[in-house]
């Protein structure tokens, strides 16, 4: 048989021409082992730190450990269907979550997926959960108040928009209650709230959502829930997801408030992930970068200036500053604030509110210890009227606690000490407040004015709260215009002081 070279070359040519360029380049690897939500993968030579990985069954993971011949990843969500030998693909993307006002009123998981049974959320945008915090030039000093509606906080440890104020205390001291009251008080203030529940019982989160709904707060609140039944990876990621949702409002010249409840559980979840990835443990078995875990999160809460907002929105929003205020919560063990995570977060934040078990059990609620609670930047942001009226209260309380300790041993006390003790007892009583009952600025001003001018001095201690409640009702019915004026101007003029004094004296006669 004679072979014709030209025929062969024609055949080869036609084959080459018919070859389609449908080949795609993909970076993929193979699962070596999977356990406890941690997966070791062989291959993935081009993977990036923090990159999203795609597993079979529409499951995603996060590449955290990049080693010479393998990659350590955490799986976000269920991992029971993943087995040895499965193919894992790189996505080329960092983990992203949906953002925007469409999330308000909804409960979502750490990946921004709805878990409240109210159907899908049609958000238009997504954003990476990890972002670099605004730089020094982009920031503006904190000088606008973030009213919590809690007398003890707004008078003694005021919080400003863009501040990070730590709420710290043992279990069952009312930490969450303080944060939820602060969210409820933002109604009508133009502040969007994000509540991040980390490692809590699903029933507790349900109760919080119900309370927010009852007080009409859910319409401006996003709840990000990583319950105790979810994987450590989801608990660790949830705080960053919530922060990314809050930054949407900050960067567009609006104000947002985010509560992390709580960062102790987030640190424990991160410790679990790190130990399973065989990272070397340090103090209290936490990994070496646990400080960075919290600092990079809390630094993203800031007040940004108008130039930053204008540049971010490409000129769509002009002349408006944005803010993200953070209220991280830390749970201490038997009041030990010198443990690793509490000291870290204290040093990162702009002040802290200490809640004490002994005060809580003795009926002082919110159980705020005025002596060691501070707000490092909030003083500049405090409302003028509250600032003017609350000056003496903090010192009165601190001296009262000190004297009360001595008075237990002294049999005969001089008149001035007795007077100070009596006043301190009444101030302590006045600062008690029921849960879910935040006060407006004007009513708070009325209470502080009354205690400063000595209208409570001749009352029995147990009558103080009843007198205050009655006084508030009287002011609302008979002096609504004065309350509205204080609410609008945030000031108490000399003429108004006289009217207010007369009104309180008037009410006291009938009490």
UniProtKB/Swiss-Prot annotation:
Topology versus the membrane: Peripheral membrane protein
Keyword Transport: yes
Family matches, as InterPro entries: ATP_synth_asu-like_sf (IPR023366), ATP_synth_asu_C (IPR000793), ATP_synth_asu_C_sf (IPR038376), ATP_synth_F1_a_nt-bd_dom (IPR033732), ATP_synth_F1_asu (IPR005294), ATPase_a/bsu_AS (IPR020003), ATPase_F1/V1/A1_a/bsu_N (IPR004100), ATPase_F1/V1/A1_a/bsu_N_sf (IPR036121)
Subcellular location, principal: membrane
Catalytic activity as recorded in UniProt: ATP + H2O + 4 H(+)(in) = ADP + phosphate + 5 H(+)(out)
Residues that coordinate or bind ATP: 169-176
Superkingdom assignment: Bacteria
Subcellular compartments: Cell inner membrane
SUPFAM superfamilies in the cross-refs: C-terminal domain of alpha and beta subunits of F1 ATP synthase (SSF47917), N-terminal domain of alpha and beta subunits of F1 ATP synthase (SSF50615), P-loop containing nucleoside triphosphate hydrolases (SSF52540)
EC number(s) recorded for this UniProt protein: 7.1.2.2
Function summary: Produces ATP from ADP in the presence of a proton gradient across the membrane. The alpha chain is a regulatory subunit.
Family: Belongs to the ATPase alpha/beta chains family.
UniProt name for this protein: ATP synthase subunit alpha
